[in-house]
Amino acid sequence: MKTLLLILGVVAFVYLEPGYTTNCFTCTTWTLSCREFEKCPPDKGTCFKRWNSTGIAIRRRYTRGCAAACPNPVGNEKVFCCVTDNCNK
């Protein structure tokens, strides 16, 4: 029984990922939709969505990506941040 537990422990240890990284939707240019996502580096585990808050909502353009911390809005921008996979849609 002890041998079985030891084997299960070793198998679990071998197949565990060394660290969890967040997946975020990403687009570096201002656009209406982002369909691509990236696996964020371990030091950038926050997803963000940034948009300009002026004008009609239907005409808003967005940027999305990974960040070490939630970016500060510039001018009339709004920023939404989250820390779960693909939460910045």
UniProtKB/Swiss-Prot annotation:
It holds the Pfam family Toxin_cobra-type. SUPFAM superfamilies: Snake toxin-like (SSF57302). GO terms for cellular component: extracellular region. Residues 1-16 form the signal peptide. Expressed by the venom gland. It is found in: Secreted. It comes from the Eukaryota. GO terms for molecular function: toxin activity. Disulfide bonds join 24-47, 40-66, 70-81, 82-87. This is Three-finger toxin 3. It comes from Sistrurus catenatus edwardsii.
